[in-house]
Amino acid sequence: MQKLLLIAATSATILSSSLSFAEGMDNEWYLRIDTGAAMFNEEKDKATGVKLKSNTTVPVDLGIGYYISENCRADLTLGTIIGGKLKKSGAATNAPFTGTNVSASHKPTITRLLINGYVDLTNFDMFDVFAGAGVGPALVKEKITYNGITGLSSNTKNRTNISYKLTLGTSAQIADGVKVELAYSWIDDGRTKSKNVIYPGTSVPTGGMRYQSHNLTAGIRFDI
């Protein structure tokens, strides 16, 4: 947690410094909120070898930003996910569970703080098309459960990773000082911690799951 707070303070300082270049310009700050639907990339469960699939999870982001110029803006966002899970039932392919019918589930908890920059690629009368990128710290942990194998379920502790985000979207003004967005984002939050669980006579590796997601979100920006 101390690492996240330190990186958060550094991120805020960098954002503040970058915005100082825009001093004297008639631009505005804004608040934003985004939510939508996301799915994780498929991954293999380390203990059993079962290939896991994602359910549909809900990403939520809150942020504050600044219009640096007519076509450029930057913001600082705090984001998380609601209800995300990688899960699958099938026959294990890894020893010592080979052939055992098992249901494996990985439920992540992800909190990320990102500095994002955006550039309008084209400007039309009704809407703009923009591209963006973000980077910052993420706290990632997961709850791992198994049905069909007793004594293997476990929880991993928080790991601080560097999260990356790429975005392509469109925005439109719906009122004075209010804009809406529709965007696709790819996010890499890194891996959770690995953990060895002692199973009768064997040390079994678990955790170490990589969380990369495809996100489709709608958002709104309010000038302040």
Swiss-Prot record:
Q: What start and end residues bound the annotated signal peptide?
A: 1-22
Pfam entry (one): OmpA_membrane
Any one GO CC term of the record? cell outer membrane
- Please verify whether the record's keywords include Signal: yes
- Keywords assigned: Signal
Superkingdom to which the source organism belongs: Bacteria
Protein name per UniProt: Putative adhesin RMA_1308
